[in-house]
């Protein structure tokens, strides 16, 4: 599957040919996770509305929830002003983080408003 050349021309990829992909929950606005996409992963996501990412460690594609059941149905995909990050607006089924939490930012708070 190939990415529309008009979209591909707007992407600013890193040295590995990837762009950052941030998933945000449509219902709550929660920022759920960040992963990586190459042109193929983005093309698959746009074609299927299933969030598809590229694993740098496994060097393969993965569809969110394919094994866990914690799927992301993609309602909208936006490209940021620099062209180096895409935002996926999704319906999240189950946990978004591989640790089992709702978001990947449910852990350590480095700075918060004073109590």
UniProtKB/Swiss-Prot annotation:
Record EC number: 3.5.4.19
Entry protein name: Phosphoribosyl-AMP cyclohydrolase
Subunit architecture: Homodimer.
Chain sites annotated for binding Mg(2+): 80, 82, 84
Cofactor note: Binds 1 Mg(2+) ion per subunit. Binds 1 zinc ion per subunit.
GO annotation, cellular component aspect: cytoplasm
Main localization, broad class: cytoplasm
Residues reported to bind Zn(2+): 81, 97, 104
Keyword Transferase: no
Enzyme class: hydrolase
MF-aspect GO terms: magnesium ion binding; phosphoribosyl-AMP cyclohydrolase activity; zinc ion binding
InterPro entries noted in UniProt: PRA-CH (IPR026660), PRib_AMP_CycHydrolase_dom (IPR002496), PRib_AMP_CycHydrolase_sf (IPR038019)
Catalytic reactions on record: 1-(5-phospho-beta-D-ribosyl)-5'-AMP + H2O = 1-(5-phospho-beta-D-ribosyl)-5-[(5-phospho-beta-D-ribosylamino)methylideneamino]imidazole-4-carboxamide
Function: Catalyzes the hydrolysis of the adenine ring of phosphoribosyl-AMP.
DNA-binding listed as a keyword: no
Cofactor entry: Mg(2+); Zn(2+)
Compartments where located: Cytoplasm
Entry's family note: Belongs to the PRA-CH family.
Pathway(s) this gene product operates in, as recorded in its UniProt entry: Amino-acid biosynthesis; L-histidine biosynthesis; L-histidine from 5-phospho-alpha-D-ribose 1-diphosphate: step 3/9
């Amino acid at each position: 599957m190939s990415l529309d050349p008009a979209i591909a021309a707007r992407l600013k990829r890193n040295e590995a040919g990837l762009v950052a992909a941030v998933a945000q929950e449509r219902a709550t606005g929660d920022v759920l996770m960040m992963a990586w996409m190459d042109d193929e992963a983005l093309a698959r996501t746009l074609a299927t509305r299933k969030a598809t990412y590229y694993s740098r460690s496994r060097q393969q594609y993965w569809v969110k929830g394919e094994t866990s059941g914690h799927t992301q149905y993609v309602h909208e995909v936006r490209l940021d002003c620099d062209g180096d990050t895409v935002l996926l607006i999704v319906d999240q089924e189950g946990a978004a983080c591989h640790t089992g939490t709702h978001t990947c930012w449910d852990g350590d708070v480095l700075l918060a408003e004073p109590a």
